[in-house]
Structures are given as structure tokens and as C-alpha cells.
Amino acid sequence: LLDRHVPKADAILLGHTHFDHALDAPAIARRDGATVYGGTSATALLGLHGLHDQAVTVEPRRTYEIGPFEVTFVPSVHSKLVLGLKVPNGGEITCEHLDGMTPQAYCCGQVWGIHLAVAGATIYQQGSADLLDDEIRHTDIDVFLCGIAGRQMTDDYVGRILPRLDPKTVVIT
């Protein structure tokens, strides 16, 4: 499916490193020579695949120029999906060998909201239904890609994030 719609990726942006977000990043990076941007767990994951040189460990609130895009990684938190008490598989990826990478080994790592600006348009992607309220400084967003898994476990998630971003369009993901 990806090959049909995205013939070549130049960059991969990881908001966190649970398997459902990061599993295919090394394969796509290897296939296309793409650079993977994310936290320290993303860098560790790429290193396990022998792709350390294709990983960028991002800095909070720094803007990266990636082709025509300006990309900013905004510190965030993951929703507490386990009975509303804890983040599943929290912590960093610590495997030293690829054969140890079970789904549970894909620990959350650092969590980011991702702000993109291109050609006068802005997009904000929140892959997990929680946030650090004071970290959201981008407003008047054109498109908000709103991750909602776990929103029931986060106090007033939608009521907190929507006024901060003030998006024109919301896409539920």
C-alpha cells in the first residue's frame, strides 16, 4: 500500500516509538535512504538496524528544514492507556540486539507533537491523546491531525488542545 501511494520517502517523523508508530520506519529508511527524525529511542531503533547515520535525535522546539517543510518537534506526553494509570511500554528502547525487538520492546520513548509549515500552510500532528499544555505555542493551525486513542483516559484532552491550536480543520486519526 505504501509503495503504491508513496514511491519514495525523504524523511520520516516519529512522534514516539511504540511499534504501531515506528515498526516500519527502519525498512522505509533503508529502502529510500530517508532520514528518520525522533527522540533517543528512534535513534536507538535505527542503530539496531545499522542505520544510525540516517537518524536525527531531535531537540525540543527546534525547527528543522526538510525540503520545503519547516518541522518543529513539540514536547508532549502519551495518554495513559493502561486503566488510565500508566503509559503502555513506557521508557526508552533499550534492546542491544534486533532479535530482542518484540512488540513490547518498542517502548514509548520521548513523545512529540509535530508542527509542519509548508507553502503558507500549517499542520499539527498529535499522535497520542495527551499533551503538555504549556508546550503548545503554535496557534491558528490550518489542519490538526488529532490522535484520539486513549482520549477517555486524558482529562479534557479535546477541550484543552483545540483552543490552544485553534485549527481550521480537524482530522481524527
Regions found by a protein language model. Name each.
Residues H18-L23, T43-L46, P60-Y64, K80-V82, ...:
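Active-site environment of divalent metal-dependent phosphoester hydrolases
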Residues D10, A129-T173:
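Cap/insert and terminal regions of metallo-dependent hydrolase folds
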Residues L1-V58, T139-L145, D166:
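Active-site metal-binding motif and surrounding structural segment of the metallo-beta-lactamase
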Residues H16, D24, V71, S128, ...:
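Divalent metal-coordination and catalytic microenvironments
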Residues D53-Y64, P68-F73, R160-T173:
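Ligand-binding grooves and catalytic loops that recognize ribose/phosphate and carbohydrate rings
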